[in-house]
Amino acid sequence: MLDWHCTWRNRADELSDSLKNTMLLGHYMVTRYRGHYYAKAQNLVRRLRRAYDDVLARYDLLLMPTLPMVATPLPEPNAPVEQILQRAFEMLANTAQFDCTHHPAMSLPCGLVDGLPVGMMLVGKAFDENTILRAAAAFEKGVDWKSLKAG
């Protein structure tokens, strides 16, 4: 698997525009600022992880919307790269922090708005995937999410 990842430069055309943008930005920041902002970001991630750990010490899990907005149509295949990137990054506001803090999180459909699914995200304590899996299974067993409407 590592060999496959090491050859990404030979297959850059297979990567999404949002991934290429993120990789280029990361490369620029490390090259230009020699890791200064990466180190600062890591310090902020530690503070963020502690803040979530403090909340999760009082609660079994957190429940929040997966996206900060209702679903929007996907950009057309020939849409400008700017539109594709905007759509990709606008969806990360509620999820990206858990990629950094490593808290287990999962999204479940919990209703419909204009015929499109709305997601709820369950976030658990570090290394406690079992709690969110049990909660998700209970929700899926007990609720017909397609019948739920916003309002």
Feature locations, PLM:
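Short, positively charged
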Residues: 14-17, 87-91, 144-147
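Glycine-rich phosphate/pyrophosphate-binding loop
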Residues: 1-18
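Catalytic machinery of carbohydrate-active enzymes
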Residues: 55
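Short, surface-exposed loop/helix-turn segments at secondary-structure junctions
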Residues: 36, 40, 44, 71-92
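Structural helix-boundary/capping segments
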Residues: 1, 19-50, 58, 99-151
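Short glycine-rich anion-binding loops that position phosphate/pyrophosphate groups of nucleotides
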Residues: 29, 67-70
